[in-house]
Amino acid sequence: MAAPPARARADYDYLIKLLLIGDSGVGKSCLLLRFSDGSFTTSFITTIGIDFKIRTIELDGKRIKLQIWDTAGQERFRTITTAYYRGAMGILLVYDVTDESSFNNIRNWIRNIEQHASDNVNKILVGNKADMDESKRAVPTAKGQALADEYGIKFFETSAKTNLNVEEVFFSIGRDIKQRLSDTDSRAEPATIKISQTDQAAGAGQATQKSACCGT
């Protein structure tokens, strides 16, 4: 008998794999640390390859285990990260509101998603470092919202430093994915959305990292 969707163990109802992608230095690791560990660091240590954290949350009476992968933003690592797109159920596209180039590159990251990820993967746009002084802001909130509207995805501005909207971002995409999985359960065999143990083992074997940081 096939196992229920992404729920191989009794301590959770769904296992959801998320990816954090975006240019180096936008604060991906800081967002991950803030959400998973409730911590924040000002040190800048570039993530090497891919690392992940796990946090279990409750949504609508269901226990959701979020497996959140922190990808390196540097171009030389992009061949590593493409292998992880296919298993992702949700992708957080992160840019730095004080760095316009990181915002402009979101379109490139979306093209990568369209090329490598599943067609039905959930996406959310995140403008990080919203705590910075307005004089340093390079990307207006309205511009971020307009880009999100163009692609039909949700948009949040966050601050890993002050914890602004960090919980809201992960809970929002988690809830959307849970709903999609629930809808799929009612229509078809769920094997296509289950992350196999083989896939997880392969991913773990490739992941190498240093201390998580504010840099990615």
Curated annotation (Swiss-Prot):
Keywords: Cell membrane, Golgi apparatus, GTP-binding, Lipoprotein, Membrane, Nucleotide-binding, Prenylation, Protein transport, Transport. A motif (Effector region) lies at residues 44-52. This is Ras-related protein RABE1c. InterPro entries: P-loop_NTPase, Small_GTP-bd, Small_GTPase, Small_GTPase_Rab. GO terms for biological process: abscisic acid-activated signaling pathway involved in stomatal movement; ethylene-activated signaling pathway; protein transport. It is a lipid-anchor. Involved in membrane trafficking from the Golgi to the plasma membrane. It is found in: Golgi apparatus membrane; Cell membrane. A lipid is attached at residues 213-214 (S-geranylgeranyl cysteine). GTP binds at residues 22-29, 70-74, 128-131, 159-160. It comes from Arabidopsis thaliana. It comes from the Eukaryota. The keyword Membrane applies. One of its GO terms (molecular function) is GTPase activity. The keyword Cell membrane applies. Induction: By ethylene. PROSITE patterns: RAB (PS51419). Its main location: Golgi. Interacts with PI5K2. GO terms for cellular component: cytosol; Golgi membrane; plant-type vacuole; plasma membrane. Belongs to the small GTPase superfamily. Rab family.
